[in-house]
Amino acid sequence: MRRGGTYIDATVGLGGHSYEIAKRLGAPGHLIGLDKDPAALEIAKAKLVVRRSSFVVGQDSSAGVSPATSDWPKITLLHRSFADLENDQRPFLACPELGEGTIDGLLADIGVSSLQLQDAARGFSFQADGPLDMRMDPHSERTAEQVVNHLDERELADVIYEFGEERRSRRIARAIVRSRPIRSTAHLAEVISAAARPMNFEPRRIHPATRTFQALRIFVNRELDDLKALLEAAPRILKPGGRVVVISFHSLEDRIVKDAFREGSIKDKYFRVLTKKPLMASEEEQDRNPRARSAKLRAAEKV
């Protein structure tokens, strides 16, 4: 990291990564945090408020800004998707000093957070009963309930297969259509479990509904499209020597990141790949944080 530089945490979440970046960044640095989830931004705000700085977390394209102090960077929190970095310039309207080629580093920790998984009312998990929602941004229109109850059988099977890599997608989709209407996570998990007998190659610890819930979440939130947009934006907004770091948690995400970095280094020649193989969590880290077992970190530098 370059002390006093400008960095983006594209998935600020609960503020853990942002806090560590801010500690190392210092003044007169600038940290911009983006997240779709306003509830997560409120938690991050509390974590990042130091030296009596104050925040007003921004809605839409407006910002919550903490001024820099002698040893703490300016911090701007935006309720925006990181896909907007490619789609338009709205995230930067609150940061007029920023523009193309001005960012020293960009971090994205892709996927659902522990906070979202543990809140039954958000509908991300089959571990507790809740409404079929699955929206990271509660202001977005499409919910998992709408997908489950309104897509036709073929479309639903395609979603489950493409985004969940679920080989039993057609059987599961057929069972879902026959069981409509489905309003809760528990009901959906029950339908999937009855339709999807475990395959011989699957570890017994994987619940039959795991891949289908993943597929619905990715589809509802357009996660892969957003990731592609972020990777397209990175070479435009980074300075020469600026770095993009992406942490992913399943093969679909990792494949997109790997391909984007490889294409950017070979075909377009605007990236230098820093991680020939993804970095994985140590055994110690996995013991502290079991979710880290599936995490893969890749990094590239703009040339």
Write out the residue ranges for each language-model feature.
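S-adenosyl-L-methionine-dependent methyltransferase catalytic core, i.e., the SAM/SAH-binding region
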Residues: 1-51, 70-95, 99-303
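Short polybasic linear motifs
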Residues: 53-55, 61-62, 67-72
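Prokaryotic Sec-type signal peptides and long signal-anchor helices
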Residues: 58-59, 96
